[in-house]
């Protein structure tokens, strides 16, 4: 079946997280019609920190310079463009973190910039570029079917409403309903699973952090490694705050949380005392950093798709992007950025489809298959590598505090594989493959 030449090519974006919003701006730039279907009442994001590495920033600019500008408006870069990896257990000097010294294992130099911001600030910036009439809120997807007359996708929502689209892009996160519609929901189907890593996250005033830890330890990003856990502190000068992430490797299973809110399934109440006990064997800097958490806080389960990946990101007129496609642990700071890379390839591929007078189901399927082909292996690498980086930072194999050179080589190599990706080449490859595939797939294209 083929779309009528008089009907505009329409993209349905399910999910209004960062990947979905970035894709929307990229489509807008390329004059591709779209609608975002967001289950929440607004685009509100948590006020926790998020990082974007150089590859992600290049993809932002290629999507639309306003995406990169939205980020840089609210982002901070670590002093000197480095992340200091230190031994978080053994410190020299006193028990006062302002005067104690942690052994520097190595410095990770981020060429081109490693920047962080609060999620909510970035979202507030980027939504300003999306027309309000392109968004529908409180739309909880129930199923995706095919209109047998037109061949287009039919989205059915829990409120009884339906929508039609030429292609559907699932940007609906780790518990993706789009993914479920593609592959099913039983235990053998692709899905995100508990990685046995949990985290405590918080933002504290930078002045408070400086008073507790000292100016030297709050002027740059520091990753404190240690047995079974690690802590990352990132100063965000533009918002006068320090973002603290404390991660623990957990042997238990994550309990099933019954809630209508998808994000709350991965959150449990916790206390500062619980967090401080987990880091009791660490040095004074880590213990003091964790002590700045509020008395009542939350602990977050880290889910990824290492054990149950999707076999492909595309199936017919439907595909996945971001966490819905390749949820990963946050240990390399690359997950959100890979969603931006996904959005760039999709925006370019969909722009080609939108320019065609007619788009059949065959051509739409081929185009989305090209996106999957270009993005799949790199994304699966990140899932594996990010999990391994967490093992390195928590000394799973050995006391890396005593083998800094070997640790340095491993993490630096992984980091450059993440950062140095040829973004322009990725897009060129996708368009070249698309041209070859569709040339013989449909003469109406």
Swiss-Prot record:
Bilayer disposition of the protein: Single-pass membrane protein
Taxonomic superkingdom: Eukaryota
Glycosylation sites: 31, 358
EC nos: 1.-.-.-
Bilayer-crossing regions: 8-28
Signal peptide: none
Functional pathway: Secondary metabolite biosynthesis
Example GO biological process: secondary metabolite biosynthetic process
Cellular component terms (Gene Ontology): membrane
Keywords tagged on the record: FAD, Flavoprotein, Glycoprotein, Membrane, Monooxygenase, Oxidoreductase, Transmembrane, Transmembrane helix
InterPro entries given in the database record: FAD-bd (IPR002938), FAD/NAD-bd_sf (IPR036188), FAD_monoxygenase (IPR051104)
Annotated localization: Membrane
Family named by the database record: Belongs to the paxM FAD-dependent monooxygenase family.
Its biological purpose: FAD-dependent monooxygenase; part of the gene cluster that mediates the biosynthesis of sorbicillinoids, a diverse group of yellow secondary metabolites that restrict growth of competing pathogenic fungi but not of bacteria. Sorbicillinoids biosynthesis requires the action of two PKSs. SorA iteratively combines three acetyl units and the growing chain is modified by the ketoacyl reductase subunit, and optional by the enoyl reductase subunit in the second cycle. The polyketide is then handed over to the PKS SorB, which adds three more acetyl units, and two methyl groups.
Name of this chain's protein: FAD-dependent monooxygenase sorC
Natural source organism: Penicillium rubens (strain ATCC 28089 / DSM 1075 / NRRL 1951 / Wisconsin 54-1255)
Lineage: Eukaryota, Fungi, Dikarya, Ascomycota, Pezizomycotina
């Amino acid at each position: 079946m083929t779309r009528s030449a008089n009907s505009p090519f329409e993209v349905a974006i399910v999910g209004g997280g960062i990947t979905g919003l970035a894709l929307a701006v990229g489509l807008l730039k390329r004059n591709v019609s779209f609608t975002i279907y967001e289950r929440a009442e607004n685009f509100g994001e948590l006020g926790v920190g998020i990082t974007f590495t150089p590859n992600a920033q290049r993809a932002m600019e290629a999507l639309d310079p306003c995406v990169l500008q939205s980020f840089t408006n609210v982002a901070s870069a670590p002093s000197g463009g480095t992340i200091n990896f230190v031994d978080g257990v053994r410190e020299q000097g006193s028990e006062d973190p302002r005067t104690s010294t942690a052994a520097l294992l190595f410095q990770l130099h981020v060429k081109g910039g490693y920047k962080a911001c609060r999620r909510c600030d970035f979202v507030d910036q980027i939504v300003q570029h999306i027309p309000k009439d392109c968004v529908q809120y409180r739309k909880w997807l129930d199923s995706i079917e095919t209109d047998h007359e037109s061949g287009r996708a039919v989205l059915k929502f829990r409120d009884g409403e339906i929508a039609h689209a030429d292609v559907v892009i699932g940007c609906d996160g780790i518990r993706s309903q789009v993914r479920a519609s593609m592959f099913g929901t039983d235990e053998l189907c692709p899905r995100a699973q508990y990685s046995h890593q949990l985290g405590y996250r918080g933002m504290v005033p930078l002045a408070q952090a400086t008073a507790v830890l000292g100016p030297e330890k709050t002027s740059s990003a520091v990753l404190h490694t240690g047995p079974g856990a690690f802590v990352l502190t990132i100063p965000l000068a533009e918002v006068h705050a320090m973002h603290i992430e404390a991660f623990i490797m957990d042997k238990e299973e994550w309990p099933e949380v019954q809630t209508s809110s998808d994000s709350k399934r991965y959150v449990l109440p916790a206390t500062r005392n619980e967090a401080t006990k987990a880091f009791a064997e660490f040095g004074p800097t880590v213990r003091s950093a964790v002590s700045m958490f509020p008395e009542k806080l939350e602990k977050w389960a880290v889910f990824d798709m290492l054990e149950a990946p999707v076999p492909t990101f595309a199936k017919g007129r439907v595909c996945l992007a971001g966490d819905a496609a390749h949820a990963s642990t946050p240990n390399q700071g690359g997950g959100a950025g890979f969603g931006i890379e996904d959005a760039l390839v999709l925006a370019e591929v969909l722009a080609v489809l939108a320019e065609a007078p007619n788009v059949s189901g065959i051509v739409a399927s081929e185009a989305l298959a090209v996106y999957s082909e270009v993005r799949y292996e790199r994304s699966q690498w990140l899932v594996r590598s990010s999990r391994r980086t967490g093992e390195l930072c928590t000394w799973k194999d050995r006391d890396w505090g005593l083998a800094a050179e070997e640790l340095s080589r491993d993490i630096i190599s992984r980091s450059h594989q993440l950062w140095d990706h040829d973004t322009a080449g990725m897009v060129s490859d996708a368009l070249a493959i698309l041209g070859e595939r569709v040339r013989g797939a449909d003469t109406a294209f």
